[in-house]
UniProtKB/Swiss-Prot annotation:
The organism of origin for this protein: Dictyostelium discoideum (Social amoeba)
Subcellular location: Endosome membrane
Keyword set includes Membrane: yes
InterPro entries recorded: Adaptor_comp_med_subunit (IPR050431), AP2_Mu_C_sf (IPR036168), Clathrin_mu (IPR001392), Clathrin_mu_CS (IPR018240), Longin-like_dom_sf (IPR011012), MHD (IPR028565)
Upper lineage: Eukaryota, Amoebozoa, Evosea, Eumycetozoa, Dictyostelia
Protein name: AP-3 complex subunit mu
Phenotype upon loss of function: Cells are viable but are unable to retrieve efficiently some proteins from early endocytic compartments.
Swiss-Prot/TrEMBL keywords: Endosome, Membrane, Protein transport, Transport
Keyword Hydrolase: no
UniProt function note: Part of the AP-3 complex, an adaptor-related complex which is essential for the compartmentalization of the endocytic pathway.
Domain MHD: 178-420
PANTHER family: AP COMPLEX SUBUNIT MU (PTHR10529)
């Protein structure tokens, strides 16, 4: 599968390199970084799969780092992408959600220890987080002090309890004074809306995250209000797939701590919580001027249901020939990057008493051609305590004698939410 693995910083520096099938020349990373720079110049994202005469370069970008897998022969691309994502998720659990170049450098030893356990000869081997945490202790001030004083390693010498059993993701003998389990339903909206407000394409990508603090070996059964609407469902290994196929019921023995229970897609969504009305046009002439009028607001049913639409940001990529702007906004703040000519309008929380708008003019460089097309607006937002698909958890039964405390939280946010002007 993987011949080599690299972690590359956002400036092109190689932070981590791991080789399983012979030492690979670093020039392959230079070739990859050239592709990244070329994609940035074109205003696009780097392709996840890059083919070269000798290798296949498969990558994911996360925050300020790139995870790059190099394969010498054809493999299933999704398998490699999923493995790279699993590596990144493991780093997040060990080092925190903000994975930067500094984070990787500070936890250099732990990164290599995790890679040694997670892959065997380039193939995924141990990827279950709870199992890894039993073998490699997460970094911390206390653990570092103990290791330096006693001279002991943070890697255990014996296999964790239950590692050779059928339920490898959960160790035996877990006890809590307070038994509780929480679920987060997080849904992202990916859609394209044309200039007339009609939906060109739309889908929801959702996931259910779980935080489990239950004693013993609990066997849980979960039911949903409308499980038939879920497409392309991907489960944690703890879920009994046959039970889902037959009854659309989730039956599982959960890992201890945090884990992703499942991910899914929902298609055919035709109503969104926010609307964008963009009007961007350019006049013909030697000194072309563009008129801008963009309105962002909440749909009426959201106001009635008292939903809170927060962290709203509208991004407008203007023409490279734009020289200056004369814009005003009644809510929030905005600014344009002089190099990329991308305007970012930070609205924040949409108020219920008035509608945010941005209007004014943009001027083009003298003698430049009028843009052939108007820009598409990318919108970001977050709605707490709301699942746009309508998915809810109807019931959760536990096989243990105790009665656990249960909680569910929903969040809807924008993924690739594009509105054409």
């Amino acid at each position: 599968m993987l011949s080599s693995f690299f972690i590359i910083a956002d400036q092109g520096d190689i932070l981590i390199e791991k080789h399983w099938r012979g030492l690979m020349n670093r020039s392959i990373c230079e070739y990859f970084w050239d592709q990244v720079l070329q994609s940035k110049q074109n205003g696009s994202s780097v392709p996840p799969i890059i083919s070269t005469p000798k290798y296949y370069l498969i990558n994911i970008q996360k925050q300020n780092v790139y995870l790059l897998g190099v394969c010498q022969s054809e493999v299933s691309p999704l398998l490699v992408v999923d493995f790279l994502q699993r590596i990144y998720d493991t780093f997040v659990e060990y080092f925190g959600s903000n994975i930067t170049s500094a984070t990787i450098k500070e936890n250099f030893v732990h990164v290599y220890q995790l890679l040694d356990e997670m892959a065997d000869n380039g193939f995924p081997f141990t990827t279950e987080l709870n199992f890894l945490k039993e073998m490699i202790k997460p970094p911390g001030v206390l653990s570092n002090v103990i290791s330096s004083v006693t001279g002991t390693s943070n890697i255990t010498d014996i296999l964790p309890n239950g590692s050779l059993g059928a339920i490898q993701w959960r160790k035996t003998g877990i006890k809590y004074t307070q038994n509780k389990i929480f679920f987060d339903i997080i849904e992202e909206i990916d859609c394209i809306i044309d200039s007339n407000g009609y939906i060109v394409s739309s889908e929801i990508n959702g996931e259910i995250l779980c935080h489990c603090n239950l004693s013993g070996m609990p066997d849980l059964t979960m039911t949903f209000n409308n499980p038939r609407m879920l497409d392309d469902v991907s489960f944690h290994p703890c879920v009994r797939y046959s039970r889902w196929e037959n009854d659309r019921v989730l039956s599982f023995i959960p890992p201890d701590g945090n884990f992703k229970l499942l991910s899914y897609r929902v298609k055919g969504i035709n109503q969104f919580p926010v609307y964008v009305k963009p009007q961007i046009s350019y006049s013909e002439g030697s000194s072309s001027v563009g008129r801008v009028n963009v309105t962002v607001g909440a749909k009426g049913y959201n106001v009635q249901n008292k939903l809170s639409i927060e962290d709203v940001v509208a991004t407008i990529p203007f023409s490279k020939t734009t020289s200056s702007t004369n814009l005003t906004a009644n809510i929030g703040s905005f600014g344009m990057d002089e190099q990329s000519k991308i305007l970012r309008w930070n609205i924040g929380k949409i108020p219920k008493e008035k509608t945010p708008f941005l209007n004014g003019t943009v001027s083009l460089i003298a003698g430049s051609m009028t843009p052939e097309s108007t820009p598409s607006i990318m919108l970001q937002f977050k709605i707490p305590q709301y699942a746009i698909s309508g998915l809810t958890i109807d019931s959760l039964a536990c096989s243990e004698r105790y009665k656990p405390f249960k909680g569910v939280k929903c969040t809807t946010k924008a993924g690739k939410f594009q509105v054409r002007s």
